[in-house]
Every structure is written in C-alpha cells, then in structure tokens.
Amino acid sequence: MKVLERLGNVGVVPVVVIEDVAQAVPAAGALLRGGVDVMEITLRTPAGLEAIRAAAAGCPDMLVGAGTVTTLAQCKQALEAGAQFIVSPGFDREMVAWCVENGVAVTPGCVTPTEIMAAAALGVNVLKFFPANVYGGLEAMKALSGPFGGVRFIPTGGVDAKNLAEYLAAPFVFAVGGSWLCAKKDIAEGKFGQIEKLAAEARAIALGFELGHVGLNRPDAEDSMAIVEQFNRAFGLAVKPGASSNFAGSAVEVMKSMYLGEHGHIAIKTNSVPRAVDYLKKRGFAADESTAKYKNGALAAIYLTESFGGFAVHLVQK
C-alpha cells in the first residue's frame, strides 16, 4: 500500500512532539493499540531525529513520518533516520521537487492559490493546510477546492475530537492532523493509556460505524412486497419499491430473492467505506470485492466475506 493511501485510510495523523527519545516507542505503541498506525514526529525538538529513528526501529508496524521539515537537508536527515513521509509547514520548491524525483511521499503546507499551483506543477496534490484555524478552516479549503478540484488537504491546527467528524466529512479533506490525541504533556507525564484512549476515540469518530438497516431474504418480489406492507401497517414505515429489493422506511430491506446470508444481511453505515475496509482487514475481516459498488468513482458499499450469526454484513457509505 502506498504511503499516502495509508494516511488517507487512517484519516487521522497524530502530530507528535518528543522531548525525550525514550518516550518515542511507548508513544508509538500507545497509538498502535488505539488503532492509529501512522504518526508524524516533528523536528521541533533536538530529540526529533533520534525519536524518528527509535520509533521506526522499535515499532515496525507504525508508519513514521517527519514533521516541521523546512529544508532539504532536514528532509534527507529524517529519511536517513527512518521517516517514510515528509511533512512541511510551508512550500519549499527545492525540497518538494527532490522528494518527487526520489519517490518520497511529501505533503507541503499550502494555503494560497499560488502555493497550490506550485505544488500541483510538481505533481503533488495532497497538501497540508496549516494552521487551518487561522487560514479559514473548512470554508477556505472549500473555496480553494473550486479551482483546484484535484487537490485534497490535510488540515492541521484547531482540529480536535469535537470537530473531527465535520472535517473528515468534507470531500476535499484527505485526512486531518493534530496533536490532541498524542499531546506533548501526556507524553512527558507517561500517560500512554490516555494516548491510547484518545487514539481509539479519534479512530471511532473517523469510521463512524452505526446500524444502517436489516435485510431479509425472501424468495420472490411478491413475498418481499407483502412483508414491507406488513411493516407499513404495523409501524407506518413507508413502502419504497426497488429493483432487487423493497424497503420499509430506511430500517428494513426485504430482498426479492434468497440473497447473501442464511437469514439475510445487516448494513453498517460508515463515514468512509475504504477506511472501514482497511480497518476491518487489520482485524482479520476481509471484504468481498465481487460485491463492491461504486458511486462517482468511490467505493460506496461492500460485503464482508464472513457472516455474523447467519447474517451477511455489508458496509454502506453515509
């Protein structure tokens, strides 16, 4: 999997400031236990480079990147230490061009049309938007996405658990960055359980799992319609005819054939089907690619290969 694809699948990129190299591996481990397997260790402290080296060596499952990289020399040092992606607060043409030429994933900070055009000219279309709260946040990125539709942003600064879902729901947001889930204070005080908890919370918000509907298998269209009409009479759920199934409101789908699942299926809504597929794969639950459905080129629904209590389960984009 490509580095940027992995960042997008996680959805949240912790911005980590390490003062003591000995804290790098415990911090990385806490994030991993919380379900976040990417981290951006900044070069804001003298320990930054060695922290990258320690985390990359000590936690091979963690995708470690370098942040606050402002020069090409720093970029090369970070890569030598084990960084797998480079994040810069601004746009340095020399550094970005070198990264592109050498196949290094880089997300430079770009907040103006001029900077975005300069990055796009080099083939870079995933950009850091920093500080997001100072430069207009979602409204600014939405405006910029008009003329630059091929660009997606990683807003950092002013993003936390309270507004994470709102940011990730925007189609022009690739992922978000932030220090709230791996705070400098928590690292310094050894509160790695708190870091794990915040990482898990952020991951849950990014995925947004919730029950969508329950699907029942029936042998034919006539039987399907009879059941949705029964739900209508009992609960007032509106009858919604469809090509392969009928719905009773939005809660019950009744198939017109004996479809997947011994008893039927359960739909789980999510904020991002691709993120959910990646998340579940890491937990041993595979997706059935033959059932994938796309909308506007994006994966919108897919079944899992495993059944749950006789029910097939499929993911549905909110």
Regions from the language model: what does each represent?
Residues 251-256, 281-318:
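Vicinal oxygen chelate
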Residues 89-95, 128-138, 172-195:
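Glycine-rich phosphate-binding active-site loops on the catalytic face of alpha/beta enzymes
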Residues 27, 71-81, 114-122, 139, ...:
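Catalytic cores of alpha/beta
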Residues 32, 36-59, 180, 185-187:
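Glycine-rich, proline-tolerant flexible connector loops at the mouths of alpha/beta enzymes
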Residues 15-17, 38-45, 62-70, 75, ...:
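Catalytic beta/alpha-barrel core
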Residues 99-104, 185-207:
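C-terminal helical cap(s) of enzyme catalytic domains, especially alpha/beta-barrels
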Residues 14, 31, 78, 127, ...:
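Conserved, mostly hydrophobic/aromatic
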Residues 3-17, 203-228, 261-268:
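N-terminal beta-strand motif that seeds the catalytic metal site of vicinal oxygen chelate
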